């Protein structure tokens, strides 16, 4: 059915955000690099051109051939896209006298224009550009302006091509979602039929057809992605799904046992493997973050390969790959090195030569959670904070020892349980504790101490690309600090990380 939206990516940092806003309207969309336009466009109802870090005036500026699209499908050209049509089709683009970054207010000039229906007067929009459209392209009609940008929006007569200089996908554009809805539903005629329920039905049907009676092996992590992937596959192929949950000794306190029990209660065919001693041995003497990651990854492959060999006649390896991973692997900036490139590569473990099945590969993180809810997965599992693949190894700065893991598990448990008790857990996107490679002087009773320092970290975010530190109540921080110092032997100082991303990252390593 022709109801999909094609998003052409020109390298903008906001391209994935466009796709998420479209999906929020229950409309399916896919992202393609601007130079890899699908040959078959029969399934698409509309096209959106993204912004770009390039200037259309630059010699190496993206210049795609849109002849198979223009005049045949409705087009919404965002930022660079708007300048592209002007620059290459009879208009003029020059450096702005006043660079416009941030908030601006929109004045709609053209009355009764469907693109701006139900959008408030002086609506706030988000600008991010240093070039301006001085002259509109051939047959261009101005639709809106701001105080600094004369041609903030226009359309091209004789075709359903609309261009806007601002970013409707960014939250700061207060009516951006309405504008996208106007374009996609009222102008392009797409239908809002992309729902979690429909995705589940379609995916289960496709998995049954693709996998049939073959066996599938899946490594579970306890995270949202692998859990939802497992339940979807189980719904499609039942006991032919073999799940392996590896304890690397770097999980949170009691996590291995509690999550394994939850998986079994869900009816999954899962085997728990305690390989904690093997991982700690592989990490012995390592302090460099990348060396630690590599050691954990290699050990996991060895453990998983050993366990996968116990299952006879496995054909497929399932992965919890989600859409941002897929987009990155075919991005404008070139493919990243990912596990997906491992097919039939000599020298790799046998399980990595299996056929790949990725039931979530077209979903964003928030959609994975909605699908999980549709599948009836416990909200506690779905609402869990993101947790790094290497586990506590990258929250213990420096070398790893069993004693350091014990200390951090206790500290982390007190912090996370405190967030739950204070009804703060669901207001935080990610939280955790970090064991620092320093000791500090303290006083306990009449004795001088020289013990470990731990940092607490809590951030709010939408997707982890950017993050702000959470202003937790002082009373909560005070109580948590006191509890940690009194209960965890070996810790005498607690600090709270108030760094945002950027410039800092969420994890310390």
From Swiss-Prot:
NCBIfam families: guaA_Cterm, guaA_Nterm, PRK00074.1. Catalyzes the synthesis of GMP from XMP. It comes from Christiangramia forsetii (strain DSM 17595 / CGMCC 1.15422 / KT0803) (Gramella forsetii). Keywords: ATP-binding, Glutamine amidotransferase, GMP biosynthesis, Ligase, Nucleotide-binding, Purine biosynthesis. One of its GO terms (molecular function) is ATP binding. InterPro entries: Class_I_gatase-like, GATASE, GMP_synth_C, GMP_synth_GATase, GMP_synthase, GMPS_ATP_PPase_dom, NAD/GMP_synthase, Rossmann-like_a/b/a_fold. The active site is at residues 79, 167, 169. PANTHER family: GMP SYNTHASE [GLUTAMINE-HYDROLYZING], GMP SYNTHASE-RELATED. This is GMP synthase [glutamine-hydrolyzing]. The lineage of its organism: Bacteria, Pseudomonadati, Bacteroidota, Flavobacteriia, Flavobacteriales. Pathway: Purine metabolism; GMP biosynthesis; GMP from XMP (L-Gln route): step 1/1. Gene3D superfamilies: 3.30.300.10, 3.40.50.880, HUPs. HAMAP family: GMP_synthase. ATP binds at residues 221-227.
